[in-house]
Amino acid sequence: MAITYSVGDMLTKLRNASRVKHGSVDLKMSNMNKSILNILKEEGYIKDFNFLEKEGIAFIKVLLKYDNKRNPVINKIDAISTPGRKIYSSYKNMPRIKNGYGILIISSSKGVITGKEAKNKKIGGELICSVW
């Protein structure tokens, strides 16, 4: 049985669904995915998400967000760390995404937070993805 990287799978599904202008996308449930989606919702990159169950398997239904001209709010969403290549950063060396217009999502000892929060709290962590 193949093991999937749920975060990478989620990022790919969000990217593909927003490019073809779908209204929503279903993702496999995981605590990491839920934490990342909470940040994306707080930062205004998605409308909302809710939980559902199909045939005993838990899913997250994500409602994608578009501007007035039906352009996706998520222009680019890229994984930074992968299962085979984890990338860590201290708060001092946290990269800026699109000169401050994008966000960096990291996994730290305080949970999944944005790069801006990590700098304010002076904690580093694993760089999960960048969004702009």
Curated annotation (Swiss-Prot):
Q: List the PROSITE patterns hit by this protein, alphabetically.
A: RIBOSOMAL_S8
InterPro entries, per the entry: Ribosomal_uS8, Ribosomal_uS8_CS, Ribosomal_uS8_sf
Keyword Cell membrane attributed: no
Q: What's any one GO cellular component for it?
A: ribonucleoprotein complex
Q: What's one Pfam family the UniProt record gives for this protein? A: Ribosomal_S8
Q: Which GO terms describe its molecular function?
A: rRNA binding; structural constituent of ribosome
Q: Which UniProt keywords apply?
A: Ribonucleoprotein, Ribosomal protein, RNA-binding, rRNA-binding
Domain of life (superkingdom): Bacteria
Single GO biological process annotation from the record: translation
Q: Which family does it belong to?
A: Belongs to the universal ribosomal protein uS8 family.
What role is this protein assigned? One of the primary rRNA binding proteins, it binds directly to 16S rRNA central domain where it helps coordinate assembly of the platform of the 30S subunit.
Assembly notes: Part of the 30S ribosomal subunit. Contacts proteins S5 and S12.
- What protein name applies here? Small ribosomal subunit protein uS8
Q: What is the lineage of its organism?
A: Bacteria, Pseudomonadati, Spirochaetota, Spirochaetia, Spirochaetales
